[in-house]
Amino acid sequence: MFALPVRKFHEPYYERKPSHAKKINGVYQTLTTAGMEVEDGIRKAKELLKENVNPELMRRALGIYLIHSRDAQRRKIVVPPLMSHVSFLSNRSIPPQTVSTTAGPTVVAGEVVTADTFQGPALLSYWREDYDLNDFHYYWHMMFPGTTVNVGGENIKLMDRPGEHFLQIVSQMVARYETEGLCWNLPLVRPWNQYDDILEHGYVPVPGLIEYYGGYPPFSSWYSVRNPDIPDLPQVDVSRKQMETWRDNIYEAIKNGYFWGKKQGTNAERTPLPLTPDNCMDLVGSVVDAEYLTLPPSPDGLSVDGDLYGNLHNYGHGNFAEISYQNYPTKAAQYGLMISNFGALRDPCFWPWHKHIQYFRRLASAKFPQDITAHRAHVRLSSLVICPQRKSTSISREDGITAFLGPPALNLLESKAKIGHEPYQWSVDIQSTRSSPPSEDSPQALTLRLFIAAGDLVNDYHSWIEMDRVTVHLTSKSTLTKVRLDTDSSIARKMGSYSELDPKSTSPWDRCRWPQHMMLPVGKVEGMPFVAFCMATDDTTAPRTRVPNSNTFEAIQSDQRLSDPLGMGYPFNRAWVQDVMDNAGKASIRQIISDAQTYPFMTTTTFRIFRATKMFQDSILNPYIPPASVTWFNTIKDYFLESDKTCMLYAYGYDLGNYDHVRLHSGAILDATSSKRMPLQMSPWSQENPDPNHPLWTPEMCDTFRAWMLNGCPKGTDSA
């Protein structure tokens, strides 16, 4: 059923069209009322498909059903991976009906494209088109379908603070994407704050998706009203002016400290619903994503006035998807990838739009600054280290961690490369400072929170990437060294690449974490500096909000490890009093987190991420790191013998004793020397049996020459 294609006779269905939400809710409720067992829902789904229900609609409804069915959870029946989708099966080299959904990826070795080839968003296509990243996003939207799940006529709230979760996942995706761009010296993403902005770069979906989704040329923008090529369907489009009104109303609400509310079904006057430190982030996120049903009603029965604030996030998806709409006479009408959770991340326009959505989180986080000592654990942290697990391997370095770009799985619609990194670990020393020392009878519980940020982004709250969160119990005052492997992370997805399930991790939450192989940015060849930050908190100081009890969702509710009692992304979820209230103007995040004397429950360290190339699945080639001290005068000019200079001047017209000539032809020189075609050997000597007095370049000489090139061919000073 997940592999069935959409035909022309099917009534259109688009995941990101808000007006289509009733369709999905209707089909989902039909499945849930079919019976208590999964087989009942499956049989009902088959009946609906025979009645020509759109297969794309059924994929989403059935996915939500399987995730939230108590019978499916008990029997560990999981949603098929994204590779079971018709778009992936159509790209297999054998007929789709004969393909097993457990077949491994067809990894094709080939060129790994880098900044030398692509510029702008195209350079990060390998990251956006990653199979596991898109599977994570697709599954996340079925796990949290945007509102509540209806069971027996009752709306069941799946999790506490859904609006806060929404803003956190958006902010973390943007932070990781921008950091990946910095690894290639790309600028930060420009947010789509102005709705008449333009997309400077175009986009064309990968070959397997161009049959289903449209692209757009450079310098595209939203239509002011609607794309004239789209059929006139009711409740499909929202004008740019209406979107701007919703946006400005939300801005005004955050600024004023309240949203307008009213009693449903009445014409009563609007009444302010105040924002507080406890509800601000969740309320703002729920309004931006139009998750009105998830908001608890106020004691006097008021709810947020949806007419004022609309459905900004989802209609924004639709406006971008309209840009790509193409009505081919021989194909089904095509929206862009932004119309679907299936592949929206692949489209570069996803990122400026969600950088804009992140700005609502930025505004909310600045509204109520927090004291970062309020939930401190009474401990002293020190000796924070993040490093490779095994330093004896061929790719491990003493001065950092190696990430790599390897061959993509083309049949799973990956593009250009597959990102990965060597296994790493982190550790920190913990010593209790509690007035009553911890013991076996009276342990001290605390939570360690690990984040990283690019060195240039340390002072931006929303650029910190959450890496791990773990509870530790101290039973003595002695120093404890806590060591965590990368696969232990509570943030990392508990499954292997290409949807390989871990039998030990079958909770629905386990697929809602960040892909394991993408936990680290790709880094730079010469090493990119990062800061790691660890904080110890006492979470018992903040009462945990729990989802209302429901047997139907018992397995989900008992395993809400994604929730954080101190706030999603704490302590970077809100501005710090220690920062914004500093009258001297000298405080900054960098300065605060480095002050171990004032804040002993925090510690930092620096490390580097080095980029390598993985040409095949089983081999990684370490790049040569350019030594910055090599210049023309102190090293390179001595590589060329007088006979070489005479030969090249006579045969090719350029002088190997001339700096400008060598710099101009450095690429050709490196190619000839590394392939041992130069220096040219004269009889009776040969390239295979070179003259000892006129030797070929050693590998070290070739590496040094290449390093000199990568550093811009520095000339240096003539000591003579």
From Swiss-Prot:
Pathway annotation: Secondary metabolite biosynthesis; Alkaloid biosynthesis; Mycotoxin biosynthesis
First-level EC class: lyase
Free-text comment on the cofactor: Binds 2 copper ions per subunit.
Recorded catalytic activity of this chain's protein: (-)-cyclopenine = viridicatin + methyl isocyanate + H(+); (-)-4'-methoxycyclopenine = 4'-methoxyviridicatin + methyl isocyanate + H(+)
Keyword list, A-Z: Copper, Lyase, Metal-binding
Residues given in the record as Cu cation A binding sites: 137, 141
Residues bound to Cu cation B: 313
SUPFAM superfamilies for this protein: Di-copper centre-containing domain, E set domains
GO molecular function: lyase activity; metal ion binding
EC number(s) from the headed UniProt entry: 4.1.99.-
Cofactors: Cu(2+)
Listed InterPro entries: Di-copper_centre_dom_sf, Hemocyanin/hexamerin, Hemocyanin/hexamerin_mid_dom, Hemocyanin_C, Hemocyanin_C_sf, Ig_E-set
Function: Cyclopenase; part of the gene cluster that mediates the biosynthesis of penigequinolones, potent insecticidal alkaloids that contain a highly modified 10-carbon prenyl group. The first stage is catalyzed by the nonribosomal peptide synthetase penN that condenses anthranilic acid and O-methyl-L-tyrosine to produce 4'-methoxycyclopeptin. 4'-methoxycyclopeptin is then converted to 4'-methoxydehydrocyclopeptin by the ketoglutarate-dependent dioxygenase penM through dehydrogenation to form a double bond between C-alpha and C-beta of the O-methyltyrosine side chain.
Record-stated family: Belongs to the tyrosinase family.
Name this protein carries in UniProt: Cyclopenase penL
Species the sequence originates in: Penicillium thymicola
Gene name for this UniProt entry: penL
